[in-house]
């Protein structure tokens, strides 16, 4: 099995743009720099997972339909082992080199990678639109220290969504109020997103 390589930036670049803790709605200011030629590159995943001098760029996609948000439970196979059994509102995944032949990604190829990741993990019936609504950083735990989330909001014209992955279980749509009532059961990034959605 070949070694997986994933998209990263150097931590000092993040600090230079403006490090933050929690949710940052000024996404474009960061993406313009992160996705500029030469500012991102691919790194062996085992190294990236234990190296806080780099940030893995993780698209974190939220799905909304008719006032409700997709929620699921992380299963025990695949994905980030440190998040198993948590509830999540975000479908997240690393961006791999097969998304681009070059050494780094520009905006269009990044967005293509996001769509490919969603197609691999979910079966969505109907059309959708998407936009980036913010970024997530959480240096309070070992998972967050090596990741930077880019939050994509997908607006769906149907709630007919099924899982393609064993790691995505018990899919349902909840109102924001119901989600906040279950806030303690959400993984950290989902808590951060839910808190933002509650005041947005």
Describe every region a protein language model picked out.
Residues 1-168, 174-200:
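N-terminal leader/linker segments that precede catalytic domains of diphosphate-processing enzymes
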